[in-house]
Amino acid sequence: MLKIFTTQLTGIFSRIQDKESDAIEDGARLLAQAVISGHSIYLYGANELQGVFYEATESKEPFPSVKAFPENAEEVTESDRVLMFCSGTGTAEEQELAKELYEKGAGVVCVSPAAKDSAGIEQYCDVHIDSKLKMPLVPDEDGTRYGFPSLMTALYVYHALSFTLKEILQEYA
């Protein structure tokens, strides 16, 4: 089972690298605007994806200008940026939040699986990065699947954004 999980997860990471590199660069450029101008990057991740916030703030390589998403979205200004991580295509609440931020003019970078139709959260994002994780990775004998590593794929994209942002900021300095 571990071999299947590892193979499938490696495949997802490869697809993100191959197909989302432009979106990752666009997202990092949008986030760099907040860093360079002295504004905030608010990080949103519900449930298990709160782990991305802890990586961004408590690791040996903290993400610049990052803050926890506030209780009240009205605190986010149009000069701030928002980095949203969603394990699915966006709950109704997440889509409403993204829509509010998008309409306010705060730059929104969202990481989530792409929706099959246009009803996903990406419609309210300035930049959408497809996490490629649409279903659990390991098949069971009865046909069910398990092993849904949403935090692992979110952290992979987070680090890709972090590395790209660092390069952009070094070019700017």
From Swiss-Prot:
One of its GO terms (biological process) is carbohydrate derivative metabolic process. SUPFAM superfamilies: SIS domain (SSF53697). It holds the Pfam family DUF2529. InterPro entries: DUF2529, SIS_dom_sf. GO terms for molecular function: carbohydrate derivative binding. This is Uncharacterized protein YwjG. It comes from Bacillus subtilis (strain 168).
